[in-house]
Amino acid sequence: MHGDTNATFAVGEIDNESRELIKVTEECIWRGIEAVKAGRPLSDIGRAIEDHAKLHKLGVVRAFVGHGIGEQFHSDIQVLHYYDARNSVVMRPGMTFTIEPMITLGTWQHKMWDDDWTAVTADGKRTAQFEHTVLVTETGVEVLTGGTGAVSGFSPFSK
């Protein structure tokens, strides 16, 4: 079985705008995780993330999405981090997928470097990203990559 997680960390001194971007991005992932409920569409996750980002006048990179995960590292489920009613797959107990919003100070559009790996926002503004692997349960959600230290003060699960 596979798991997938990542986080953004400040290295050295950073400006207040970058610090706020990291904080709001982490809040966004927990808003998305909180929206995981059996019987609800995946679009609820995107709505929760996008609404919180917009509240802080930030954008959501659209080209990179969460994915189904389990025996295969990437499976067919796509978890958008912005609202799109067409993302109507209904969450069912036993489903596992990642939630991994990339939040930006600027445009949601991106461009690829010549190395065919590195992606940057089209306007060159900074981004931050957090990711967890989650399991839909009968009563809500289990954060599978939420081991010791992974659940922060922004998490509704830390209270």
Label every model-predicted segment.
Residues 1-159:
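Active-site neighborhoods and metal-handling regions in enzymes and metal-associated proteins
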